[in-house]
From Swiss-Prot:
GO BP term, pick one: proteolysis
Signal peptide extent: none
Origin species: Pseudoalteromonas translucida (strain TAC 125)
InterPro entries referenced in this protein's UniProt entry, alphabetically: Creatin/AminoP/Spt16_N, Creatinase/aminopeptidase-like, PepQ_N, Pept_M24, Peptidase_M24B_aminopep-P_CS, X-Pro_dipept-like, X_Pro_dipept
Protein name: Xaa-Pro dipeptidase
Residues noted as binding Mn(2+) 2 in the record, renumbered to the chain: 244, 255, 420
EC number(s) per entry: 3.4.13.9
Cofactor note: Binds 2 manganese ions per subunit.
């Protein structure tokens, strides 16, 4: 039997147990989870690409089929209402026969408006979980997305099953293939558009299948944190390349970033090497029992040391941190949970009731503050950038006297650096899925 199929049985058992626990606690008969609906573009007859409800794809890898429903109570075999219309305009999904199908009682739905007859008749004690509240109300649901239920699932989503970990390994494998192709295209003089196409070709996934919009940036564009344009024309001179791009496997995401210097020599290349070394060391700092926020604080110490070593800031590292200069050059968080969503839910939670884990003082904008525990998956993605707007703000402060502005100007044509790996925390070890696949 396929490895995923074996692991999936334990995954479903875990989801059933979680469902049973929260339904008993909240006095619910069960949950009705909606995959979602296609969204029509304004004043048009075309639709936006469909994105499935993450609570739905936690149960099964059906990512591209709207109007599906799961009815589950944690004790009985889950019921899957699978949308399969008669349609000569579009490709109709095949009847489910994959490894996961045997774990569901499957009923086929021909038309979305016929679903009511397949749902529980009395919905008073069933909770609707999904985006389309007006649909839920029309169907007779009075309990919709109850906060205690969502908090419970979001908290426990951080603890990955073995099936989920295997899916994340596969997502990394696909993404690494794309990264290697993108890297080669950059060193062959390709444009951002060329690099993006090479990435998609190597992953065998379309742009809409990517878990997020790829960031493919050359030169100064590397300073734009979420740069999602693709210049079709190659620059006259290639200086640097930053790629932040992932892949999808069964609904689970990879999220990987690399930065390259075109000449592979000189001070920016050395800066990339220094950031890479810091990133690897920070990754080894993921220890069960520690706060992820503390690792973010340590990242600022590492960035400060690099700013000092390269004479970008003419101060010792300790004083750079004390003066909060690092936030100009490293303005985002160290990373986040990874799973069904790129920025997976539950990163701020202190318990399953929804209490929040406070961020470290002076670092309010993090995506993860949680206690690190085994079977959790994190990204580690330190950065160092030369962003005009932030540098302009810095120039208006007393700290401007400590900045080597000539050095800053020399680095501006390169934009910035970000390095990112995806790491599993085990009880007594770490598994860097990204570097295990030989992506330097």
């Amino acid at each position: 039997m396929d490895k995923l199929a074996v692991l999936y049985a334990e995954h479903i058992a875990t989801l059933q147990q979680r469902t049973r626990t929260i339904c008993e606690r909240e006095g619910l008969e069960g949950l009705v989870i909606h995959s979602g609906q296609a969204k029509r573009q304004f004043l048009d007859d075309m639709y936006y690409p469909f994105k499935v409800n993450p609570h739905f794809k936690a149960w099964l890898p059906v990512l591209d089929n709207p109007h599906c429903w799961i009815v589950v109570n944690g004790s009985d075999k889950p019921k899957l209402i699978f949308y399969r219309p008669v349609d000569f305009w579009h490709k109709v999904p095949d009847e489910p026969r994959d490894f996961w199908a045997e774990y569901f009682d499957i009923e086929l739905l021909l038309q979305p408006d016929q679903v009511e007859k397949l749902l529980p008749y009395d919905k008073a004690n069933y909770a609707y979980v999904g985006e389309y509240l007006e649909v839920a109300q029309a169907l007779g649901f009075s309990v919709m997305n109850p906060e205690p239920v969502l908090n419970y699932f979001h908290y426990h989503r951080a603890y990955k099953t073995q099936y989920e970990l295997e899916c994340l390994r596969n997502a990394n494998r696909i993404a690494v293939d794309g990264h290697k192709a993108a890297r080669d295209t950059f060193f062959n003089g390709g444009s951002e558009f060329d690099i993006q196409q090479a990435y998609l070709m190597a992953t065998r996934q379309s742009e809409n299948e990517m878990p997020y919009g790829n960031i493919v940036a050359l030169n100064e564009n590397c300073a734009i944190l979420h740069y999602t344009h693709f210049e079709a024309k190659a620059p006259q001179q290639h200086n640097s390349f930053l790629i932040d791009a992932g892949a999808n496997f069964n609904g689970y995401a990879a999220d990987i970033t690399r930065t390259y210097d075109f000449k592979k020599q000189g001070e920016f290349a050395e800066l990339v090497q220094a950031m890479t070394a810091a990133q690897i060391e920070l990754g080894t700092g993921l220890k069960p029992g520690m706060l992820y926020g503390d690792l973010h604080v340590e990242c600022h110490n590492r960035v400060a040391q690099i700013l000092s070593d390269f004479d970008i800031v003419k101060l010792p590292a300790e004083e750079i941190v004390e003066r909060k200069i690092t936030s100009t050059f490293f303005p985002h968080g160290l990373g986040h949970h990874l799973g069904l969503q790129v920025h997976d839910m539950g990163g701020f939670m202190a318990d399953e009731m929804g209490a929040q884990q406070a961020a470290p003082e002076g670092h309010p904008f993090l995506r993860c503050t949680r206690i690190i525990e085994k079977n959790q998956v994190f990204t580690i993605e330190p950065g160092l950038y030369f962003i005009d707007s932030l540098l302009g703000d810095l120039a208006q402060t007393d700290n401007k006297q400590f900045i080597n502005w000539q050095k800053v100007e020399s680095f501006k044509p390169y934009g910035g650096i970000r390095i990112e790996d995806n790491i599993i925390v085990h009880e007594d070890s770490l598994e860097n899925m990204t570097r295990n696949l030989a992506l330097d």
